[in-house]
A protein has these predicted regions:
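Structural signature of tandem-repeat unit edges
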Residues: 1, 9-10, 14, 19-21, ...
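Solvent-exposed serine/threonine-rich low-complexity stretches and specific carbohydrate-binding patches
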Residues: 52-68
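Short beta-strand segments and strand-loop junctions that repeat across beta-rich extracellular domains
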Residues: 42-56
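Register-specific detector for alpha-helical tandem repeat solenoids, activating on a conserved position
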Residues: 140, 166, 192-193, 218-219
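A short beta-strand element within beta-rich, extracytoplasmic domains
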Residues: 16-40, 84, 123-130
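Non-cytosolic beta-sheet module surface loops
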Residues: 23, 33-40, 89-91, 156, ...
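Noncatalytic modules at the cell exterior or secretory-pathway interfaces
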Residues: 29-31, 75-92
Length: 243
């Protein structure tokens, strides 16, 4: 596409770097990307470490009626201290409860940076603003119990889809600061249980209270025991609700 043709549509604030993890700790950390897909459709992903070449990545499906306790096959990538791991690819179209999630070894210190939309398409992901184009459960449980994660990536989408960020950071008890969000239109259960059990979280993004959708903020900060206040927007005026 000619950039001139759609330059007015691109959010200039979107990071053009693919989603990536940086090991800032002093020990190796295993990281893998796994899918939960009832229809067993294999998404296509690539990864690279530091300035290396992009390599194909096998995403195993954890949904299997033969193995009700979870995935029996794994594809971990060893991330050494000071190394950076990049991911990009094409997410499967979702018409049911299917999603991708990371498995991360405990006991490390991992920063996440870049544009999370590189998990939706491998190129020009920085044009994405409407998550409805990628189905429901877009980033559902993406960092499920990734206890080595110490921060959250910026969330660029303007228009959310149902359950898109539901349980996204559940159990990520290393995160202290909430991500910057750019939401203009909510969806049902979009932020449901998003930070549940993030007991080190100390702040929240500014949350809109106009045009709410069913369960959009339901238990968003449940058991966030370090949180003292939640920042809400009423008629374009910032307000605070104490814990």
């Amino acid at each position: 596409l000619d950039p001139i043709d759609h330059a007015v549509d691109i959010p200039i604030y979107q990071d053009k770097t693919p989603l990536h993890f940086i090991n800032i700790g002093d020990r190796d950390c295993n990281i893998e990307l796994t899918s939960y897909c009832i229809k067993n459709i294999n998404p296509q992903y690539e990864y690279k470490i530091n300035d290396g070449e992009w390599l194909k990545y096998k995403v195993y499906n954890s949904y299997n009626i033969m193995y009700p306790n979870g995935c029996q096959e794994h594809n971990p990538i060893i991330l050494h201290p000071n190394d950076t791991l990049y991911f990009r690819g094409s997410r499967l179209d979702q018409i049911d409860k299917s999603y991708l999630y990371f498995i991360m070894q405990d006991g490390s210190s991992i920063e996440v940076r870049g544009n999370i939309h590189s998990l939706l398409k491998p190129d020009e992901f920085y044009y994405i603003t409407d998550l409805n184009d990628y189905g429901i459960y877009t980033f559902y449980s993406l960092f499920y119990h990734c206890k080595s994660l110490i921060n959250a990536p910026q969330l660029y989408a303007h228009i959310l889809s149902a359950s898109c960020y539901e349980k996204m950071f559940i159990g990520c008890d290393g995160i202290k600061n909430s991500p910057v969000i750019h939401t203009l239109k909510l969806a049902s259960s979009c932020y449901r249980d998003m930070f549940i059990y993030c007991d080190k979280l100390t702040n929240t993004p500014l949350l809109s209270t106009s045009k709410l959708e069913p369960s959009c903020y339901y238990r968003m900060f449940y058991e966030c025991t370090s949180l003292k206040e939640i920042k809400l927007s009423f008629d374009d005026n910032d307000k605070y609700i104490k814990k």
